[in-house]
Amino acid sequence: MRKYETVFILNPALDEEGYKANVEKFKGVIENAGGTVDNVDLWGKRKLAYEVKKVSEGYYTLMNFTADTELPKELDRVFRITDTVIRHMIITQE
């Protein structure tokens, strides 16, 4: 098991409940694959440095989790097919 960190930005058109529902969805993906979520930090709505997909702000979330080496690939796939995700990044913690 390795430690990972992911940051993702969600579309600002979501309401607060939709934002939290998406965060819970991604937590569920991690937990259903046998991983554990160590920390979730909801940064809220912030301005982007530049426009992405014609959007200038988004909901930022930082999530730390522990999982096997295959889970980040699955989580990346889920991020890519979820329309509300503007940008995401998954890194391995040292």
Curated annotation (Swiss-Prot):
Matches recorded under HAMAP family: Ribosomal_bS6
Organism: Clostridium botulinum (strain Langeland / NCTC 10281 / Type F)
A cellular component annotation (GO) from this entry: ribonucleoprotein complex
Main function: Binds together with bS18 to 16S ribosomal RNA.
Gene Ontology MF: a single term: small ribosomal subunit rRNA binding
Keywords in alphabetical order: Ribonucleoprotein, Ribosomal protein, RNA-binding, rRNA-binding
Domain of life: Bacteria
SUPFAM superfamilies recorded: Ribosomal protein S6
Biological process, per Gene Ontology: translation
InterPro entries assigned: Ribosomal_bS6, Ribosomal_bS6_sf, Ribosomal_S6_plastid/chlpt, Transl_elong_EF1B/ribsomal_bS6
Protein name from the UniProt record: Small ribosomal subunit protein bS6
Similarity remark: Belongs to the bacterial ribosomal protein bS6 family.
Record Pfam families: Ribosomal_S6 (PF01250)
